[in-house]
Amino acid sequence: MENVGVGMPFYDLGQTRVYPLLSDFHDLSAERYPVGFMDLLGVHRHTPTHTPLMHFPTTPNSSSSEAVNGDDEEEEDGEEQQHKTKKRFKFTKMSRKQTKKKVPKVSFITRSEVLHLDDGYKWRKYGQKPVKDSPFPRNYYRCTTTWCDVKKRVERSFSDPSSVITTYEGQHTHPRPLLIMPKEGSSPSNGSASRAHIGLPTLPPQLLDYNNQQQQAPSSFGTEYINRQEKGINHDDDDDHVVKKSRTRDLLDGAGLVKDHGLLQDVVPSHIIKEEY
């Protein structure tokens, strides 16, 4: 056993040391012939009929690449959602602009000591705001009718404190309320009775006294505004005049303002006089 491998070639030495059991499978004549390099490595040349599937273990690089791909998909989904939300926001904004109608505004400048002028409609004050570079605040009013959205802004002019600037926003959707005739004792020279008869707004006593002192004609503030408002309301002026006249007569008769003077009431019954009147 000590002389084993002495004088043997390198391929035989490697064969006997590394694979001692190969002699059982090969002939003795194999020692005489050179052995190939693949035989030295112990790799058999025959190929199996069925090759098993190769399952490679997951490496850190493959897992990281999958994570990166997942992040990219999430980012794309987030960008798509943001794009959709932006489109929806733009669409709603454009629809709001289209549905929002322009409200007409009309402004009047009137010389008056009274800030809130009587224009024939009923208003409710809902706010007050200071005006830049002006010591006079701005007052905000709203029409008291439930289905009417007309607003009014009243402020005194900074350049001319004796003038009042009234701005109307919108158009009334209802007729003006009927005006009540003044009581007995009021002088017709001030023009209040004639203004109420033709449908113009009655001004407060303070403003009437101020107008009489200044000897000015009645302002066109009420007439111009009312004419613009009544253009959008369809009604018959003659019928309205008759109704106002009959209601005014009933009010005067009920208050006892119309009295019979002289002896005519002793001869003719009172109901005949009322019918002829």
Curated annotation (Swiss-Prot):
Residues 84-96 have a biased composition (Basic residues). Residues 112-177 bind DNA. GO terms for molecular function: DNA-binding transcription factor activity; sequence-specific DNA binding. Residues 51-96, 183-206 are annotated as: Disordered. It is found in: Nucleus. This is WRKY transcription factor 68. One of its GO terms (cellular component) is nucleus. It comes from Arabidopsis thaliana (Mouse-ear cress). The lineage of its organism: Eukaryota, Viridiplantae, Streptophyta, Embryophyta, Tracheophyta. SUPFAM superfamilies: WRKY DNA-binding domain.
